[in-house]
Amino acid sequence: VGSEMCIRDRLVPARNFPVEVLFLRDDDIPESVASGVADVGIVGLNEVMEKRCPVGILKKLGFGKCRLSLAIPQNIDYQDRNWFSGKKIATSYPGILSDYLHKNGIVSDIHVITGSVEIAPGIRLADAIFDIVSSGSTLVSNRLKEVETVVESEAVLIGTDSISSEKRGILD
């Protein structure tokens, strides 16, 4: 069974408010705002950082809080971040991870995975992971432990300088 969602299904006018809401995948939002497809967007700070699009953070929204962290198997004796030198790290956030490793003088092999990153060490695909952590329960259930927090994230409202004053007034 298949279906195709068209733009009509994703673009919804608001009632009693002069806006239309466009539903997109979170990783598409920064580029859609940067390119002018959308005036503003609500997305995780982690996606803004990873996509590196020319957008500004208009407001931190105080929900969707999580962190991007490095995690390793629970049975490993971890001393410091130099443990990651020469290791293979699975992630869906290669840009943020690469910046962190470079800043800390660590050379590692980054393996990009788009989902279920937490299983990578268990199936010997990687030595460690770099992924979103909220409660940490997914890490525990996969016998991993969080050892380095790299980014604290939450939902943010993003936009560009090109938004009109009329539209800025609606945001206020």
Indicate where each model-derived feature is located.
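Paired acidic/hydrophobic, glycine-rich loop segments that form the ligand-binding mouth/hinge
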Residues: 22, 38-44, 127-133
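Ligand-binding pocket segment of bilobal, Venus flytrap-like solute-binding proteins
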Residues: 11-14, 120-121, 130-144
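Short, small-residue-biased leader/transition segments that mark boundaries at the very start
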Residues: 1-7
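Pocket-flanking alpha-helical
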Residues: 27-32, 37-53
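Ligand-binding "clamshell"
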Residues: 50-60, 137-152
